[in-house]
Amino acid sequence: MKKPYRKISDYAIVGGLSALVMVSIVGCKSNADDKPKEQSSLSQSVQKGAFVILEEQKDKSYKVVEEYPSSRTHIVVRDLQGNERVLSNEEIQKLIKEEEAKIDNGTSKLIQPNNGGGGSNESSGFGLGSAILGSAAGAILGSYIGNKLFNNPNYQQNAQRTYKSPQAYQRSQNSFSKSAPSASSMGGASKGQSGFFGSSRPTSSPAVSSGTRGFNS
């Protein structure tokens, strides 16, 4: 049986979440007349989606193992036995709401120093909600809570830890960079911040199809 991640090519490669980093550094090098066009292009890219595969770990936490731009957002959960299923929109929204409550009361792993603290269900890793918000999909689905994570230094570090490995994170960055507007046309790109909430605030949350520094050692 073919797994969903082997059929990623079926989805249009159009996202562009790494463009969030670019938009924050558009400065004097950009022509004033080009800015409206650039902003429009970025806005359209951000409002697209991401195909994300989350893998269950032995401690019942979850990690991002694959992530690609997509015409719509799909989140696939793979359990310890290798079984996969696509989260429904209702499941995703419930998980994000639960994680938002943790962010509000300071117990979310995403904002804990050194990835510490949090609830007992996330004793040594990230739960589904925090893994989703740490991924590219989180910048789309959780855009309305971006202000709560924006410029949070702990989030900047922990967001990358939601990825299974540095290689998984780099594949994601490369994938989204390829689908984003070219850096040369926007005065270059900054790599000073990590996490998809790190440099801009998406303003809308598109429909879900039912279907960054330092890693854990």
Curated annotation (Swiss-Prot):
- Enumerate the InterPro entries for this protein: UPF0323
Q: Where is the composition biased (Low complexity)?
A: 172-210
N-palmitoyl cysteine lipid attachment residues? C28
Q: Provide a GO CC annotation, any one.
A: plasma membrane
Q: Which PROSITE patterns match?
A: PROKAR_LIPOPROTEIN (PS51257)
Q: What are the Polar residues biased-composition ranges? A: 160-171
Report the sequence similarity comment from the record: Belongs to the UPF0323 family.
From the Swiss-Prot or TrEMBL record, give the protein name. Answer: UPF0323 lipoprotein HPSH_01205
The species is Helicobacter pylori (strain Shi470)
At the highest ranks, the source species' classification is: Bacteria, Pseudomonadati, Campylobacterota, Epsilonproteobacteria, Campylobacterales
